[in-house]
Swiss-Prot record:
Protein name listed in UniProt: Shikimate kinase 1
Residues the record lists as binding Mg(2+): 18
Pathway: Metabolic intermediate biosynthesis; chorismate biosynthesis; chorismate from D-erythrose 4-phosphate and phosphoenolpyruvate: step 5/7
The entry's keywords: Amino-acid biosynthesis, Aromatic amino acid biosynthesis, ATP-binding, Cytoplasm, Kinase, Magnesium, Metal-binding, Nucleotide-binding, Transferase
Entry's Gene Ontology BP terms: amino acid biosynthetic process; aromatic amino acid family biosynthetic process; chorismate biosynthetic process
GO function term, MF aspect, one: shikimate kinase activity
Residues annotated to bind substrate: 36, 60, 82, 140
Species this chain originates from: Pectobacterium atrosepticum (strain SCRI 1043 / ATCC BAA-672) (Erwinia carotovora subsp. atroseptica)
GO cellular component: cytosol
Amino acid sequence: MAEKRNIFLVGPMGAGKSTIGRQLAQQLNMEFFDSDQEIERRTGADVGWVFDVEGEEGFRDREEKVINELTEKQGIVLATGGGSVKSRETRNRLSARGVVVYLETTIEKQLARTQRDKKRPLLQVETPPREVLEALAKERNPLYEEIADVTIRTDEQSAKVVANQIINMLESN
């Protein structure tokens, strides 16, 4: 990869976007950003608090602005929030400004990876987590697929293995 293209990671919560993104950025000597962490940095509050105070719509507005700004940079790896693809504007920007990698995973793996994580506002509800994740998958998976240049399943692989797969796919294209 001679030129430094932007790499944008999309996929559901628990797919490994942040972990794999950090690994990928380190291996490629690129700058790493996580849209949720960037929102937390700018607001001085965690994502759950922003959700509670501003609602999902307020959070998505912030997310859209942050992703717009970050995707204007060059040579970055960006881990997006799982719901960021709900915005057509965000989908268009991701597609136009870099390579979109869809990190795909099963509901079972999502449950295992998120069960103790209290920073998942959409799972902090009365509805059983499996039902929430299934509903989100039905709504969002087609949107991830719509903009993906590359799709990689992350279920039984380490972050380093997935990062290497992404690098190999990018180099062969």
